[in-house]
Design a protein with these regions (language model features):
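A short, basic N-terminal segment
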Residues: 1-74, 224-225, 229, 233-238
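Phosphate-binding P-loop
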Residues: 76-84
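Residue-level preference for the first positions of well-ordered beta-strands
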Residues: 84-88, 121, 161, 194-196
């Protein structure tokens, strides 16, 4: 057990030095892990990411799918610069599209660590957005107009980056989907706010079934990134 520090005898500087001398310095890996757990992971939770997406780093190793994931992340990073880009990650289930999007956010948070920059980001499924915003398009439901307008302003103006998942899995409220999505994308683009769309469709099916005005926005201001490799759920990475 260490001896008590008497600041009257040693002085403040000496007391602090003696206290610090007993602290074992952390390695770079330990500091990164500490910063991730205390700063980045809580933000990912606040942004709406499920626990499985709150992990630092994509899969690594010789598996070709890991290499492809990193290539798509690099492409996503090259497109999004805080100027209203609209990008779609498309491909079969289990290829890691949401992991790519979450890693993009993680990399952004690392870049902002120990700076005054603080990006506001949200991950939502389209069913959630449509369920809340459909009142704007004729179905008032039970939500108040004041709360509705606040939520729409949050999505269109406050968020630096909005990630919308499962954009083709809206059935009951599909009549509102295209109007809501088009309005969100147009308003966010005008405000120079970036948006990432995620779909389990192939690139061809996505282009065929998506509103032409949305495809035009994608072609003009971002693009479609196809993740067309075998699902990680079918076969573990090597």
């Amino acid at each position: 057990m260490s001896e008590p520090i008497h600041t009257g005898e040693l002085g403040i500087v000496e007391a602090v030095a003696k206290m610090l001398s007993g602290i074992e310095p952390k390695s770079d890996a330990e500091m990164r892990d500490y910063n991730f757990k205390t700063y980045i992971a809580p933000k990912l939770e606040m942004f709406g990411f499920e626990e499985r997406y709150r992990k630092d780093g994509l899969c690594d190793g010789p598996d070709e799918r890991c290499k492809l994931q990193r290539q798509k992340l690099a492409k996503l990073t090259n497109v999004i610069h805080g100027k209203g880009a609209i990008v779609a990650l498309v491909g079969p289930r289990g290829t890691g599209k949401t992991y790519i999007a979450s890693q993009f956010v993680i990399d952004l948070l690392w870049a902002e660590l120990h700076t005054s920059k603080c990006s506001w980001i949200r991950y939502e499924k389209l069913t959630t957005i449509v369920g809340r915003l459909k009142a704007f398009y004729g179905d008032m439901g039970t939500i108040s107009m004041e709360k509705l307008e606040a939520y729409r302003a949050f999505l269109t103006k406050a968020l630096d980056l909005l990630i919308i998942d499962e954009i083709h899995e809206v059935a009951e409220d599909s009549k509102h989907k295209d109007r809501i999505l088009t309005d969100l994308l147009d308003t966010r683009y005008a405000a120079k706010k970036d948006t990432i769309l995620i779909s389990n469709q192939s690139a061809e099916e996505f282009e065929r079934t998506t509103n032409p005005s949305i495809i035009d926005r994608l072609n003009e201001h971002g693009g479609i990134i196809s993740c067309a490799w075998q699902s990680f759920r079918d076969k573990p990475a090597i």
